Amino acid sequence: MKICIFFTLLGTVAAFPTEDNDDRIVGGYTCQEHSVPYQVSLNAGSHICGGSLITDQWVLSAAHCYHPQLQVRLGEHNIYEIEGAEQFIDAAKMILHPDYDKWTVDNDIMLIKLKSPATLNSKVSTIPLPQYCPTAGTECLVSGWGVLKFGFESPSVLQCLDAPVLSDSVCHKAYPRQITNNMFCLGFLEGGKDSCQYDSGGPVVCNGEVQGIVSWGDGCALEGKPGVYTKVCNYLNWIHQTIAEN
């Protein structure tokens, strides 16, 4: 799921994120098979979120994707068929950021430790963490099995979207008083292309590094409402410390 925002007029405009089943790549394209080998599917009886494999035993995802019983599925392309490259590994630990706020969606980041290490190969591999924070205009790749259109069923095969990082000023203008220093916007102000329902937790990869985590937005692919992503570069110390201690 991707968190969607609904607006209520109370003299001023207040926004409250609510979990809504509305998260798949809109306006993208079918990824070349196994071209995103770090992409994982989080399964709780069915696909609920995406994630990124950052070591052979750790996955990066969104805190709002937490579920008490998760299976991490690697090497997937068509999530409804067994194609031979899959590795299904149960989660041993799920560690949410201690300052995650489900109302503001700040610090929307989670680490998942696999019960056993993944076998790395051409179809299952890790993605590096960023060395620097993303800059406006950088082209990135977003991927996931989220819905292709708000309110519709999810696709069976992995979808991809190429989209630019937007400036902080554009992001704040799109979502007044909602963007924290731990978030950034990516996408197209004209709408039509975006992450959506069930893309949540999935990777935003820029220049070969995982810079973002699909987090929230106002609907999907709406004009003037780009997707909002967790800024991974702000959490490098927490990620390294958490892995070292667990």
Curated annotation (Swiss-Prot):
Location(s), subcellular: Secreted, Extracellular space
Source organism: Rattus norvegicus
Keyword Protease: yes
Active-site residues, Swiss-Prot/TrEMBL: H64 (charge relay system), D108 (charge relay system), S200 (charge relay system)
Cofactors that this protein relies on: Ca(2+)
UniProt cross-references to PROSITE patterns, sorted A to Z: TRYPSIN_DOM, TRYPSIN_HIS
A biological-process GO annotation: proteolysis
Reactions that this protein is recorded to catalyse: Preferential cleavage: Arg-|-Xaa, Lys-|-Xaa
Chain positions listed as propeptide in the UniProt record: 16-24
Protein name, entry field: Trypsin V-A
Keywords noted in UniProt: Calcium, Digestion, Disulfide bond, Hydrolase, Metal-binding, Protease, Secreted, Serine protease, Signal, Zymogen
GO CC annotation: extracellular space
Enzyme Commission (EC) number: 3.4.21.4
A UniProt-annotated Pfam family: Trypsin
Site (Required for specificity): D194
InterPro entries: Peptidase_S1_PA, Peptidase_S1_PA_chymotrypsin, Peptidase_S1A, Serine_Proteases_S1, Trypsin_dom, TRYPSIN_HIS
Disulfide bond positions: C31-C160, C49-C65, C133-C233, C140-C206, C171-C185, C196-C220
Cofactor binding: number and manner: Binds 1 Ca(2+) ion per subunit.
Family classification: Belongs to the peptidase S1 family.
Domain Peptidase S1: 25-244
Enzyme class: hydrolase
Superkingdom of origin: Eukaryota
Keyword Calcium part of the UniProt annotation: yes
